[in-house]
Structure formats: C-alpha cells, structure tokens
Amino acid sequence: MIKSFFAALSFISRLPVPARLSQGLEIEQYQRSIVTFPLVGLLLGAIAGAVALLLQPWCGVPLAALFGVLALALLTGGFHLDGLADTCDGIFSARTRDRMLEIMRDSRLGTHGGLALIFVLVAKVLVIGELLLRDTHPIAALAAACAVGRGMAVLLMYRHRYAREKGLGNLFIGKVSLQQTLVTMAMGVALATVLLGLQGLRAALITLVLIWGLGWALKRTLGGQTGDTLGAAIELGELLFLLALL
C-alpha cells in the first residue's frame, strides 16, 4: 500500500519521491494504486491550502486564493490542466470522433483549450476567495476538493474503454475492478466528510453525480476515455466540489 501511494504520487504530481519507494512495481501494482489517488489529492490540496492560509494575512484574500491555485498547478506540473485543455480542444471542435482524438493528441493549445483553462483557473480563484471570506478553512477545503476530484475520476475508468490504441490512460481505463472503484470513491467521500462534515459529504455526492454524467457524455462523444479526459475530470471535479461548498 505504501509503495502504491508513492507510485501514484510520482505519477500524478511533481513532488520528489525516492526511487526505492516508487520504482520496481509491476503494471498490476500501478493499477492497484488507483485506490490511493484520493490520498495523493489530500496531500496536494493540503499543501496548496497551507499556501493560501499562510499568505492571507500578508496579501489579502484574492492574492492568497491566487497563490493557492498556482501552488496546486505547480504541484501537479499542470498535468491535469493539460488534459482539460486537450479535451476541450477536441470536444468543442465539432469534428468526427477520429478527428477529435487527433486534435486532443496535438500538443498545441487551441482556442477552446485556452478558454477552458482561463475559465477553470479564474473560477477556482474566485470560489476559493469566496470560501475564505466565509471563513472556510483553506487546507480543509482544498484537501477535500483534491481528494474528491481524484477519487471520482475512477468513474471514467470502471467499465469504460480506452478510446485510443495506446497511451498513459490505458494503464487504468477499463482495468479497475468494481471493488477498486467503490473503495476509491468511498475514500474521497469519507475524507471530505471528515474534513468538512455534512457540507463536505453533500459536495462530494454532488460531484460524484456530475462527474458520472461527464463520463457518460464523453463516452458518447469519443467512444471511450483517454488520459486527457481523466485529467479534465480531475480538474472539473475539484471545481465542482468547491462550488458545491458555497
């Protein structure tokens, strides 16, 4: 379990992980690490929340929220944001399925991807700022949001097919079991409830339903999921959870 956690941490974040703790795992062990995704999110969100908390007395709520979002982007290396941009470039191109997947594979940023990044990042700053004004603890809010966002992404893996022939997403999509799916989601919901009480539970359940709907819509449009759509689900899951806290 410990090796799985550090494997997941090295896979979906830029935090340094000693090689002895994350290397030498079989493919099946990487797939089993999905259940630790909410714990990785918990850690990343707690660090970003701590940044916002420490800066708030010095620079005020708006800038504290901005630097909290920036910290989260740096901690993940923009990994999930890149997936969000690629997904929106493809989906909103209104082309054929194959052409959408080609566009998503293109490393260049398009108009729709740029707009999606602006919207999501600005929305996160505004929502976190509003939560700070309402005296919601930033560490609890961001830790819970990141845990739930990564926990609910499993909904785009279980009983879905990979839309391409190869890629990083193929490691998880269609490869997770029902038990892994339930444990991963339950962990995200439980962490949100522990950190934020009934408000966190409500926000987590709302996020669950909306991310399930997102997965269904993407499946109909693309014929399956990709690593990019998983990244999009994580980013949107975080934002939806934070919005549901308001």
From Swiss-Prot:
Membrane topology: Multi-pass membrane protein
Recorded catalytic activity of this chain's protein: alpha-ribazole + adenosylcob(III)inamide-GDP = adenosylcob(III)alamin + GMP + H(+); alpha-ribazole 5'-phosphate + adenosylcob(III)inamide-GDP = adenosylcob(III)alamin 5'-phosphate + GMP + H(+)
Disulfide linkage: none
Origin: domain of life: Bacteria
Record GO terms (molecular function): adenosylcobinamide-GDP ribazoletransferase activity; cobalamin 5'-phosphate synthase activity
Pfam family membership, one: CobS
Compartment annotation: Cell inner membrane
Entry keywords, A to Z: Cell inner membrane, Cell membrane, Cobalamin biosynthesis, Magnesium, Membrane, Transferase, Transmembrane, Transmembrane helix
Enzyme class: transferase
Annotated GO CC locations: plasma membrane
Cofactors required: Mg(2+)
BP GO annotations: cobalamin biosynthetic process
Broad class of where this protein is predominantly found: membrane
Pathway: Cofactor biosynthesis; adenosylcobalamin biosynthesis; adenosylcobalamin from cob(II)yrinate a,c-diamide: step 7/7
Recorded family membership: Belongs to the CobS family.
Role noted for this protein: Joins adenosylcobinamide-GDP and alpha-ribazole to generate adenosylcobalamin (Ado-cobalamin). Also synthesizes adenosylcobalamin 5'-phosphate from adenosylcobinamide-GDP and alpha-ribazole 5'-phosphate.
Protein name as annotated: Adenosylcobinamide-GDP ribazoletransferase
Species of provenance: Klebsiella pneumoniae (strain 342)
